[in-house]
Amino acid sequence: MSKLNPRVAHNPVLSRIIESGRTNLPSGITSAGSLSAYAQAAAVTIRDNRDREKREIADLNNRLARYVEKVRFLEAQNRVLENDIGLFRQAAHIHTGKVRDYYDAEKTSLATLVREQEAKVSSAKQNIRKLEPEITTAIRTLASSLEHRQRVRSDKKEQLKHLSDLESETAYIKRLINDCDDEKSHLKTEISRIRGEIKRILALRDKERNGFSRSQTAAQDLLKKLNATISTHEIAIREEINKARRDSTDKNREFFHRELHMSMKEIRDQFESDSKKARKTWEEWYKKKITEIKKRSEKFSLTQNQAREEVLRIRSLLNELRTKISDADSMTQALSKRIEDMKFREDEELRMFEQSLTEKELAVTRMRDECAKLSVELETLVENQINLRSEIAHYRKLMEQAENLRTSYQSDFVIDTPSPLMRTSSHHYGSSYSLNVRDTHNKTVHHDNYDISSASTINTQQFRSYGKGDVKIIEHKDESIVIENSNSYKSKDLSNWKINHYVNGALTGTFILPVATHIHPHEKISIHSLKSPNLMDDIVATQIYSFDFSKNTKTVLLDDVDDEVGWYAHVSYSH
């Protein structure tokens, strides 16, 4: 018994199997007791998979750690932002009083500025009187400058006519150049087409050459196959001859030998004739193709020579045209420079006259604007004076009636004639005044006149308007409301008045009337919403999309101190 391998000697199972003469070992274990190649590959794959899983788990742990760190950073940032918001809120409460002080100071400075402007108005009127003779002189100077400008323009027109003639000639030459360029591009296209045709023919020639080489290769392969077949047949024939030699007589052997030589000779003759015929056919086809390619190349070379001659002729013509164009350009530049010099002199003179005239006109415009402002203020003062006189007369009547009532009836409510006990307070908002009369018990009596207009029917629906004073909302039409001043002699200033539109008791939009909005006696003003088709009118409520006049809507008119002046709603609206 041969000596066993030490590894097998330590494995009793393998030793018994080998001693018993069995060779069917388990898969993956060789007779020497080591793992096979497949088992080793499987072990390597398992080890690689475990390493890859370990790396993925480490990567996931790192990503989780980064995510936790980012969350902590964002929480810290949120805490910092909350602290900043708290500081901003404290600062807002602290600086509110300062903003009020700034507003009061600005108001005082604006009042001072108004007084200064009033002082400047008188001096502006005097300056207007002084500037009138200078304006007359400036107008005369402007007329003379305009006459000079007309003469300069006539000369300029003549020079422009000459320049247009030169430009037309230049344009004609440029068109000739463009025509030559087109012809040149056409020739280039033709040359490129011819070159492409030559490349195509060369490619066909290369293709034919490749085909010929492939045919030769195929013929050689066929010849090799025939030689292999012949050798196979010769081997078979030799085997048959050997068999015939063993099994036949001399006569049969000679017969088979003779027949074999004759068949081999016929096969060789047939192969030689076929190969000669094929070679002759390929040679004739190759010569024919070479002849055709030579003829085409001669034709293309002739066309290319003609194209070269044409290009040379066009280049010479183009050089001549360029020379003429350069001469024309030099002349044009000289004329253009001369025209620019004349234009500069003319513009400089005209600019000086216009500058002086503009300064005078600006001064006059400023004076006119100041006068217009003064006239508006004067009209406002006159209106206020008229209103005060009418209100004084009205209150005199009330006081006379109160005096009569005091002498007729015994009452705790007493209205005396002007005395230290009666106190009147006058409040001015815009151009409207209200007067409060107090009795001896310090009770205020407001003389406000509430006017309730009659109901109106629009589109089979009834609406009602309520007004306090002369300005009220009277109707609506086409997504707009109509405001009327019922006073017959007094205008109203609607600056900063407000219009609030409510739907189902909720405020849906507010519009503030522009500054310097006045409504004259018996005048009607339409205020349109954004949904109105008449957006080109003067007043459009940009903060109110639609005046939805239904049973659940209400439109309220407020003055500049947010006191309710009137409202307009459906008769069934629940206030």
Curated annotation (Swiss-Prot):
Region (Head) residue spans: 1-56
Region span, Tail: 409-572
Key words of the record: Coiled coil, Cytoplasm, Intermediate filament
UniProt-annotated stretches for the region Coil 2: 259-408
PROSITE patterns: IF_ROD_2, LTD
A single GO BP: heterochromatin formation
IF rod domain span: 53-406
Residues annotated as domain LTD: 459-575
Domain of life of the organism encoding this protein: Eukaryota
Region (Coil 1A): 57-88
Broad class of the protein's primary localization: cytoplasm
Pfam families: Filament
Family matches, as SUPFAM superfamilies: Intermediate filament protein, coiled coil region (SSF64593), Lamin A/C globular tail domain (SSF74853)
GO cellular component entries: cytoplasm; intermediate filament; nuclear envelope; nuclear lamina
Stretches the record annotates as Coil 1B: 103-240
Gene3D superfamilies per record: 1.20.5.170, Lamin Tail domain
Annotated region (Linker 1), positions in chain: 89-102
GO molecular-function terms, A-Z: structural constituent of cytoskeleton
Its job: Cytoplasmic intermediate filaments provide mechanical strength to cells. Not essential protein.
Protein name, entry field: Intermediate filament protein ifd-1
Organism per entry: Caenorhabditis elegans
